[in-house]
Design a protein with these regions (language model features):
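Amphipathic coiled-coil/heptad-repeat helices and related helical stalk/stem segments
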Residues: 28, 119, 229, 281-284
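Hydrophobic pocket-lining residues that define ligand/cofactor binding sites across diverse proteins
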Residues: 35, 212, 236
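Amphipathic alpha-helical segments that form the core helices of the histone-fold
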Residues: 33, 229-233
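Non-catalytic regulatory/interaction regions at protein termini and inter-domain linkers
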Residues: 1-191, 195, 202, 217-220
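Conserved beta-strand-loop-beta-strand hairpin that lines the nucleotide-binding pocket
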Residues: 121, 182-185, 234-312
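Conserved short strand/loop->alpha-helix "switch" segment adjacent to the catalytic nucleotide/phosphoryl-transfer site
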Residues: 202-230
Length: 312
């Protein structure tokens, strides 16, 4: 990784395959130290177990490093690019930036995983032309084989067993498309639905809040829900054909709700990257990602479904 980084003028995005803590430290610690020695900004955004592992290994030398608990900051994979990666890189314009980002860990749910894979694929577009190196570790001892297949498809370089080699299966756009699948229907639980147009936007919001309270959403999340519902329903009216349907139900520890409309999201980075400061609008879906614990989307010509999860 260090050799790749030293020669890099622009974006580098390797996957690191590791089997144990020793292999994890053997690559990541020299990568961090090389960045610090070069005066480069370094961030580490990984699950808390690995965060503490790296923090302990670096000791006082790690003081300049920005440590981020990915299980909190990246709980929703859709906000990792804007809130974690871009936020750090944009804070250091002109510098070569190093980031260790581990968005996929053992224990990610089946609902979260497709959003993780799309996130990894989208990084390659979000940082085109930027002087950034983002190393993404993958625990080969615990993650499913398909996860490693997807990692090879979303990273142009794979670091394993001390070597860094081009990935022969690198195809991020194919990954983005292949994980854009219809969302599974809820089963075995009551689902409440409401159809809306511009005149019924206030009623749609009231409908969701009323059912969310009945389904056990805590007071601390109601403002998040209100904001997200307002953004998505307004987006349906303005960009999604003028009408939509909102559905809400409870699923395990989550409140789940979704908006269906006749629009089509043509840019897969929509909601994943902050728009330029001088561009009016374009922040609605971004805000939805910020306040939700998970956002899943299926979009096609003539219809889009956006599903949001909030812990109750």
């Amino acid at each position: 990784v260090n050799d790749v980084t030293a020669e890099a003028e622009l974006f580098v995005h390797p996957a690191l395959f590791y089997r144990n803590q020793s292999e994890y430290l053997a690559v990541n610690v020299p990568f961090i130290r090389a960045g610090l020695d070069a005066g480069e900004p370094v961030a580490v955004a990984v699950p808390r177990e690995n965060l503490e592992l790296l923090r302990g290994e670096l000791g006082e030398d790690g003081a300049p490093v920005r440590f981020i608990d990915m299980q909190q900051a990246g709980r929703n994979p859709g906000r990792i690019i804007p809130r974690v990666l871009r936020a750090f890189a944009d804070a250091h314009p002109g510098a070569h930036v190093r980031i260790i980002g581990e968005p996929v860990w053992f224990g990610r749910s089946a609902e979260e995983y497709p959003a993780c894979v799309q996130h990894e694929a989208l990084i390659n577009h979000a940082f085109t032309g930027r002087r950034v190196t983002i190393v993404c570790p993958y625990d080969t001892a615990r993650l499913a084989p398909q996860v490693l297949v997807d990692a090879r498809a979303t990273h142009p370089v794979v670091v394993a067993d001390g070597e860094h080699l081009p990935s022969g299966s690198y195809a991020p756009d194919h990954v983005i498309a292949s994980y854009n699948q219809p969302l599974s229907r809820p089963s075995g639980v009551p689902v409440f639905s409401f159809s809306f147009d511009a005149a019924l936007l206030p009623d749609a919001r009231h409908f969701v809040i009323e059912h969310a309270v009945a389904l056990g959403l805590g007071d601390g999340r109601r403002d998040d829900l209100t904001l997200a519902v307002a953004e998505l329903t307004t987006n349906s009216v303005v960009h999604g054909g003028g009408t939509g349907v909102i559905r809400i139900w409870a699923e395990d520890e989550h409140l789940v709700w979704q908006v269906e409309d006749g629009g089509h999201i043509g840019d897969p980075l929509a909601g994943r990257c902050p728009p330029p400061p001088d561009r009016p609008g374009g922040r609605g879906l971004l805000l939805v990602h910020y306040v939700s614990d998970l956002v899943r989307t299926h979009t096609r010509p003539g219809g889009t479904t956006t599903r949001c999860y909030l812990r109750r």
